[in-house]
């Protein structure tokens, strides 16, 4: 049975711009993870997105596109996650590209499939932070304030704490979790071991596991039981 995103506990994030062989992809899709999020910071094209979608669709797992550019948007996903980078220094990453997208696709958009994410990028060395000019030197109370804004002002369904390749601060994740009631807390970044997954699982509604898939698929698979226990 496919779970709605509100019920996801564990998600794998697959990058269309990275190579993954068929056996590893099958292991990921059949693993018991709750969903697959397709997205990346660079090199994401319509071609490689479509290729990855077609390969994932051989399996019954729920599949969402995290939109990183307008060119790679294609029908066929269960959900379309749209990041609004709350700590970006550039308005285009907060609402500008969103305006362009709605201007172009508004009449044909299915709003039931669209999931807005308040995105807070925490790793200054990540591609995502550079791309979006994210202000990452934030005190915990800054991040908590962004979380409150995302839930109570913007009423987005998801607040995504993105550490993008480095392991974050479990205490901050706990603090954020304590102020969110309706908005779901997604945590992504640097989870490579069972122990790291276990540290974040009590606080994040959804734990996102990405990069380790491409280095050690068995380590990636081991995070599922750690999150769901």
From Swiss-Prot:
Molecular function (Gene Ontology), one example: heptaprenylglyceryl phosphate synthase activity
Class of enzymatic activity (EC top level): transferase
EC number: 2.5.1.n9
Pfam families: PcrB
CC cofactor: Mg(2+)
Biological processes per GO annotation: glycerophospholipid biosynthetic process
Keywords tagged on the record: Lipid biosynthesis, Lipid metabolism, Magnesium, Metal-binding, Phospholipid biosynthesis, Phospholipid metabolism, Transferase
Binding site for sn-glycerol 1-phosphate: 13, 160-165, 190, 210-211
Catalysis: reaction(s): sn-glycerol 1-phosphate + all-trans-heptaprenyl diphosphate = 3-heptaprenyl-sn-glycero-1-phosphate + diphosphate
Function: Prenyltransferase that catalyzes in vivo the transfer of the heptaprenyl moiety of heptaprenyl pyrophosphate (HepPP; 35 carbon atoms) to the C3 hydroxyl of sn-glycerol-1-phosphate (G1P), producing heptaprenylglyceryl phosphate (HepGP). This reaction is an ether-bond-formation step in the biosynthesis of archaea-type G1P-based membrane lipids found in Bacillales.
Oligomer status and interactors: Homodimer.
HAMAP family according to UniProt: GGGP_HepGP_synthase (MF_00112)
Protein family: Belongs to the GGGP/HepGP synthase family. Group I subfamily.
PANTHER family cross-referenced by the UniProt entry: HEPTAPRENYLGLYCERYL PHOSPHATE SYNTHASE, PTHR40029
Protein name listed in UniProt: Heptaprenylglyceryl phosphate synthase
């Amino acid at each position: 049975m496919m779970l709605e995103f509100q019920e996801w506990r564990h998600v794998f994030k697959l990058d269309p711009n990275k190579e993954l062989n068929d056996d590893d992809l099958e292991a990921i899709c059949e693993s018991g993870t709750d969903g697959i999020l397709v997205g990346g910071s660079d090199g994401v094209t319509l071609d490689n997105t479509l290729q990855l979608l077609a390969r994932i669709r051989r399996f019954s797992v729920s599949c969402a596109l995290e939109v990183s550019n307008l060119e790679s948007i294609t029908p066929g996903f269960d959900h379309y996650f749209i990041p609004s980078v709350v700590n970006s220094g550039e308005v285009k990453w907060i609402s500008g590209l969103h305006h362009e997208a709605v201007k172009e696709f508004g009449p044909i958009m299915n709003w039931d499939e669209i999931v807005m994410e308040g995105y807070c990028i925490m790793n200054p060395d990540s591609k995502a932070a550079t791309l979006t000019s994210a202000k990452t030197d934030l005190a915990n109370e800054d991040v908590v304030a962004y979380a409150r804004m995302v839930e109570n002002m913007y009423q987005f369904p998801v607040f995504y704490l993105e550490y993008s390749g480095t392991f974050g601060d479990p205490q901050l994740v706990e603090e954020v979790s304590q102020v969110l009631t309706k908005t779901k807390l997604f945590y992504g970044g640097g989870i490579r071991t069972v122990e790291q997954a276990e540290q974040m699982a009590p606080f994040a509604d959804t734990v996102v596991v990405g990069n380790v898939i491409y280095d050690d698929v068995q380590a990636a698979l081991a995070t599922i039981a750690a999150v769901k226990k």
